[in-house]
Amino acid sequence: MLIFKDAFTDDELASDSFPMKLVDGLIWEFKGRQVVRREGEIQLAGANPSAEGEDGDEGSEECVERGIDFVLNHRLQEMNCYEDLVTFKSYCKSFMKKVVELMQKNGKSEAEISEFKRKIPAWVVSLLSKDRFKQLQFFIGERMAEGQGEGQVAVVEYRDEEDGEVPYLMLVKEALIEEKQ
């Protein structure tokens, strides 16, 4: 399994256990779903709890958590402060500068850096459109939530599909470290 970690805080933000695709060579999108499960239980996509010997209802004292599977699995924390347009724009400006510096440090070519600088503004602007922006949710990893660094803000958007509204997690590829587990 591949774990996608924030390059600045080392927070786990996603994994390849979710359907994923790379958009425009720039943004990883992870498809999630709403789940209800016992607190602390991590269920990987495609797992079948009944086939793994789990009992049904074991009592009423059990804590249940509800939410998006990738948010629960990676213990992401919702951050409402980024719902303010000015705050989010300011964050994006400083974060993208850090990403470019990271790309330079990691030995990316000038062509790769120029391509990133050319493409990323269009993605940010697409998020900022009024109708889209008010529908977004923003999450951060545990270390960033504890004040241990300033890293990537995970953007979640619900999209209408045949099955209803489906949550998608969007992360900037160049600000992630892929770690094999």
UniProtKB/Swiss-Prot annotation:
Q: Which InterPro entries match?
A: Mss4-like_sf, Mss4/transl-control_tumour, TCTP, Translation_control_tumour_CS, Translational_control_tumour_p
Keywords associated with the record: Calcium, Cytoplasm
Question: Which SUPFAM superfamilies does this chain map to?
Answer: Mss4-like
User: Would you tell me the Gene Ontology cellular component terms?
Assistant: cytoplasm
PROSITE patterns assigned: TCTP_1 (PS01002), TCTP_2 (PS01003), TCTP_3 (PS51797)
Q: Which residues form the TCTP domain?
A: 1-181
Principal localization?
cytoplasm
- Any one GO MF annotation of this record: calcium ion binding
Give the subcellular location.
Answer: Cytoplasm
- A Pfam family hit: TCTP
Record function comment: Involved in calcium binding and microtubule stabilization.
Q: Which family does it belong to?
A: Belongs to the TCTP family.
**Identification of the protein by name:** Translationally-controlled tumor protein homolog
